Amino acid sequence: LSRLSNEKRPFPSGLDVMAVFGSQRAEELLDSLYNPSKEWDGYKKEYNEVKSEFDERSIKDKTGNIYTTWLYSLESLNQRFPEGYPNFMRNKAWESKSLATALGSWAELRHDTILYGAQSSVECGGEEEEPPKVTGYVEPNPEFYNRLIWLTKQTMEGLSQRNGISDSMKEKCENIIELLE
């Protein structure tokens, strides 16, 4: 993705990232609001090459570690939903909402990776009373939830192999998996 930058654009934008990951809405916004080709003649060629490389990644490449699996999970937010899904999920407003969700998560992942890559672990939590369970609407996006399950399992396995997960944290991860299933 760093190839989508030059002296005028020192970093690829979040819209570049999400467009490469398949968001048609991100592509539309890039073209209509920013039009990077206007300031950089080689942008479209470079973009198409990077997108082609990303599209050709194997599932093993997409899920080789926690970072790439997280990105793979976000890719599922970029889909356009076919007939049969609720109408409110099949319009531009929904695509914009999903794009904002993916961009927010990507920004947090990038932030954590850059700033906290070598962070030491800290014990969290206390003896507080559990809050009441809240019920609400769950978006019918099974692909995203399946990828989150995969990400959670991969995280647990990686931490277990390094003796970096306590029994209580493992139980919390299993609860997350159960909730997502």
For every predicted segment, state its role:
Residues L1-E181:
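Polar/charged low-complexity regulatory segments
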